From Swiss-Prot:
Role summary: Promotes activation of caspases and apoptosis. Promotes mitochondrial membrane changes and efflux of apoptogenic proteins from the mitochondria. Contributes to p53/TP53-dependent apoptosis after radiation exposure. Promotes proteasomal degradation of MCL1. Competes with BAK1 for binding to MCL1 and can displace BAK1 from its binding site on MCL1. Competes with BIM/BCL2L11 for binding to MCL1 and can displace BIM/BCL2L11 from its binding site on MCL1.
Expression across tissues: Highly expressed in adult T-cell leukemia cell line.
Motif mapping: BH3: 29-37
Assembly information from the UniProt record: Interacts with MCL1. Interacts with BCL2A1. Interacts with BAX. Interacts with BCL2L10.
InterPro entries: Noxa (IPR024140)
Induction comment from the UniProt entry of this chain: Up-regulated by p53/TP53, phorbol esters, double-stranded RNA, IFNB1/IFN-beta and viruses.
Entry GO CC: Bcl-2 family protein complex; cytosol; mitochondrial outer membrane; mitochondrion; nucleus
Top-level division of the source organism's lineage: Eukaryota
Gene this protein is translated from: PMAIP1
Pfam families: PMAIP1
Protein name: Phorbol-12-myristate-13-acetate-induced protein 1
Origin species: Homo sapiens (Human)
Length: 54
């Protein structure tokens, strides 16, 4: 974007070990999956409450 400028004093992040990156990635994927699972369970509960016409 033309309006944004990069910070001049930005320091590059230190190199991480591959195992540490794998753990962080797995943790983030787990959180993402947990959020999706919770949303699906909530939607199922709502649909059971409001669509119980059978």
């Amino acid at each position: 974007m033309p309006g944004k400028k990069a910070r001049k004093n930005a320091q590059p992040s230190p190199a991480r070990a591959p195992a540490e990156l794998e753990v962080e990635c797995a943790t983030q994927l787990r959180r993402f999956g947990d959020k999706l699972n919770f949303r699906q369970k909530l939607l199922n509960l709502i649909s059971k409450l409001f669509c119980s016409g059978t």
